[in-house]
């Protein structure tokens, strides 16, 4: 899901040779942008993980994928992004060949892990709404953990070959070690299709089916014995749909540039301005800090737990027991299979 870079190996690590002549304000802007992304990424995704850990309402099958997605976003903020930041301010890569390989590998793990987890979330939503009578069996705790492990196994499997074919290279235009794919058009097309276009198609299908069912249920006039989809359910699915849309918007420019270059490199490469290539990369980087913000804005239970965690940190009580009122409130609500849904939907597929 990354585009072509320039050559880097163990004997070609001179930062002065890699540096691009850019005005100081450009590197400063990119550096500040990345610092903001790193800080929000780490704090936001830690809030997501701790929220699910602390709040019984959030401990359900659907949120296993949410936590897995948060881990995928954390991976890049902890290691690759700080190395990119170092490269920006040193105007070149001076961290050695091995760090370049590890950084590129972890970036790939993060982005492919993200799209696979988003696909898993969409399938979970689809089963919960459109096949809810089978949902409990499909998404038992054991099965859900197995699905997440499968996602990460497929993610690593998709990335490992790059370590052996020498495709992890440093690109001075974006100060990053990434995947050099210009050498093989077929490989680039395959990567974009299987790691972006195909998952996007699957997720789109799942959400279209969900919204068709939601519209049908809300238009019913006569009372029947079939349970309704609650407003909480709709809000929760909107939350996950927004997460998907933001990912697609942030990553689409980079992937389509890569696809165009792979199809006709001689014609397309001269037509792509450097600023567009750089902007598409940093826009993709920015996506890793957005999900936690979306949960806080659109999901009431996440928002409340965020506040409790912040207050707990400020009062040094984060790992102490919760208040009796909070405990009683949580005992009244039975956790549901997705996000914060408190009412199980039992509507069969339409």
UniProtKB/Swiss-Prot annotation:
<feature type="disulfide bond">
    <location>
        <begin position="100"/>
        <end position="177"/>
    </location>
</feature>
<feature type="glycosylation site" description="N-linked (GlcNAc...) asparagine">
    <location>
        <position position="9"/>
    </location>
</feature>
<feature type="topological domain" description="Extracellular">
    <location>
        <begin position="85"/>
        <end position="101"/>
    </location>
</feature>
<dbReference type="InterPro" id="IPR002278">
    <property type="entry name" value="Mel_1A/1B_rcpt"/>
</dbReference>
<feature type="transmembrane region" description="Helical; Name=6">
    <location>
        <begin position="241"/>
        <end position="261"/>
    </location>
</feature>
<protein>
    <recommendedName>
        <fullName>Melatonin receptor type 1A-A</fullName>
    </recommendedName>
</protein>
<feature type="topological domain" description="Cytoplasmic">
    <location>
        <begin position="289"/>
        <end position="350"/>
    </location>
</feature>
<dbReference type="InterPro" id="IPR000276">
    <property type="entry name" value="GPCR_Rhodpsn"/>
</dbReference>
<keyword id="KW-1003">Cell membrane</keyword>
<feature type="topological domain" description="Extracellular">
    <location>
        <begin position="262"/>
        <end position="267"/>
    </location>
</feature>
<keyword id="KW-0472">Membrane</keyword>
<feature type="transmembrane region" description="Helical; Name=7">
    <location>
        <begin position="268"/>
        <end position="288"/>
    </location>
</feature>
<dbReference type="GO" id="GO:0008502">
    <property type="term" value="F:melatonin receptor activity"/>
</dbReference>
<dbReference type="GO" id="GO:0007186">
    <property type="term" value="P:G protein-coupled receptor signaling pathway"/>
</dbReference>
<dbReference type="GO" id="GO:0004930">
    <property type="term" value="F:G protein-coupled receptor activity"/>
</dbReference>
<feature type="glycosylation site" description="N-linked (GlcNAc...) asparagine">
    <location>
        <position position="4"/>
    </location>
</feature>
<feature type="topological domain" description="Extracellular">
    <location>
        <begin position="166"/>
        <end position="187"/>
    </location>
</feature>
<feature type="topological domain" description="Cytoplasmic">
    <location>
        <begin position="123"/>
        <end position="144"/>
    </location>
</feature>
<feature type="transmembrane region" description="Helical; Name=4">
    <location>
        <begin position="145"/>
        <end position="165"/>
    </location>
</feature>
<keyword id="KW-0297">G-protein coupled receptor</keyword>
<keyword id="KW-0812">Transmembrane</keyword>
<comment type="similarity">
    <text>Belongs to the G-protein coupled receptor 1 family.</text>
</comment>
<feature type="topological domain" description="Extracellular">
    <location>
        <begin position="1"/>
        <end position="29"/>
    </location>
</feature>
<feature type="topological domain" description="Cytoplasmic">
    <location>
        <begin position="51"/>
        <end position="63"/>
    </location>
</feature>
<dbReference type="Pfam" id="PF00001">
    <property type="entry name" value="7tm_1"/>
</dbReference>
<dbReference type="InterPro" id="IPR000025">
    <property type="entry name" value="Melatonin_rcpt"/>
</dbReference>
<feature type="topological domain" description="Cytoplasmic">
    <location>
        <begin position="209"/>
        <end position="240"/>
    </location>
</feature>
<dbReference type="GO" id="GO:0048511">
    <property type="term" value="P:rhythmic process"/>
</dbReference>
<keyword id="KW-0807">Transducer</keyword>
<feature type="transmembrane region" description="Helical; Name=5">
    <location>
        <begin position="188"/>
        <end position="208"/>
    </location>
</feature>
<feature type="transmembrane region" description="Helical; Name=1">
    <location>
        <begin position="30"/>
        <end position="50"/>
    </location>
</feature>
<comment type="function">
    <text>High affinity receptor for melatonin. The activity of this receptor is mediated by pertussis toxin sensitive G proteins that inhibits adenylate cyclase activity.</text>
</comment>
<keyword id="KW-0090">Biological rhythms</keyword>
<keyword id="KW-1015">Disulfide bond</keyword>
<feature type="transmembrane region" description="Helical; Name=3">
    <location>
        <begin position="102"/>
        <end position="122"/>
    </location>
</feature>
<dbReference type="GO" id="GO:0005886">
    <property type="term" value="C:plasma membrane"/>
</dbReference>
<keyword id="KW-0675">Receptor</keyword>
<dbReference type="InterPro" id="IPR017452">
    <property type="entry name" value="GPCR_Rhodpsn_7TM"/>
</dbReference>
<feature type="transmembrane region" description="Helical; Name=2">
    <location>
        <begin position="64"/>
        <end position="84"/>
    </location>
</feature>
<keyword id="KW-0325">Glycoprotein</keyword>
<keyword id="KW-1133">Transmembrane helix</keyword>
